[in-house]
């Protein structure tokens, strides 16, 4: 992984074997970024994608493997009261299964880079977006701080 700050954004190039969410979180820790948004594209070798099932109160996870084109990645990182980062990431992958084109999309739990990923990380300027625990989903939503 290599990254540069240009203007107010960070541009991150990831390499084979990098886990995208963990790498973004690592850059935020290194650069003392408390809240940010990001987007990106790339090629991955596996992914765990989730969809929230409100009737069950839990996430359903699907794992896909192979040559996965990361068509779109978007998300944010926010800071919980204990200082830890909480992430919310969605992804869209295109791939082939038995020679047929497929897409998979949803909440991204994890994905590993196959050849590269290119991410733009945009720190929030002028404050911090905190995290508030939503009891219905047991996940963190934006919690604005005064």
What are these regions (language model features)?
Residues 1-41, 45-87, 92-146:
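N-terminal intrinsically disordered, cationic/polar leader segments
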């Amino acid at each position: 992984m290599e990254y540069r700050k240009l203007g107010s954004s960070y541009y991150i190039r990831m390499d084979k074997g990098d886990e995208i969410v963990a790498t973004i979180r690592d850059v935020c820790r290194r650069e003392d970024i408390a809240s940010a948004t990001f987007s990106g594209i790339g090629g991955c070798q596996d992914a765990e994608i989730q969809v929230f099932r409100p009737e069950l109160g839990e996430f359903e996870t699907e794992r896909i493997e192979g040559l996965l084109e990361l068509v779109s990645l978007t998300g944010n990182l926010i800071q919980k009261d204990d200082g830890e980062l909480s992430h919310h990431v969605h992804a869209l992958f295109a791939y082939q299964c038995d020679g047929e084109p497929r897409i998979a999309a949803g909440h991204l739990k994890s994905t590993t880079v196959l050849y590269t990923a290119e991410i733009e990380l945009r720190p929030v300027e002028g404050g911090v977006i905190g995290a508030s625990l939503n009891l219905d989903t047991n996940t963190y939503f934006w919690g604005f701080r005064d």
